[in-house]
Amino acid sequence: MKYTVALKQNHEFRRLYSKGKNAVSPYFVIYCRKTRRKISRLGITTGVKLGNAVKRNRARRRIREVYRTHEGKLLPGYDIVIVARTRSIYGRFDEMEHCFVQQMKKLGLIPARKGEERLGKGDKPQ
């Protein structure tokens, strides 16, 4: 991940959960918040509900790969937390990738083209 560093501190995750914008899909929940940094920071969360360590690591790898392939399109200067859901382990990768791009556009992390939906300040995705 060229333009991104890891988000590691627990208080940073909690701040994003409480104050960040969020977007929900069947594969994951994405929380983001604008920062003053020039680079973005990414955190990936997989709960014990997903299964054993092998399944959780698989979900993390798949999410990291989706993020890596679209990292160049994303605006810099955001903290991003992606919370994996069960479908991120078993679902089709191309559908997961499509959901990721759609959620990032809704959150305003990928600049929307004319005529596309984008969240304003205080709006939540549906």
Predicted regions and their residues:
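Positively charged, solvent-exposed patches that mediate nucleic-acid binding
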Residues: 1-126
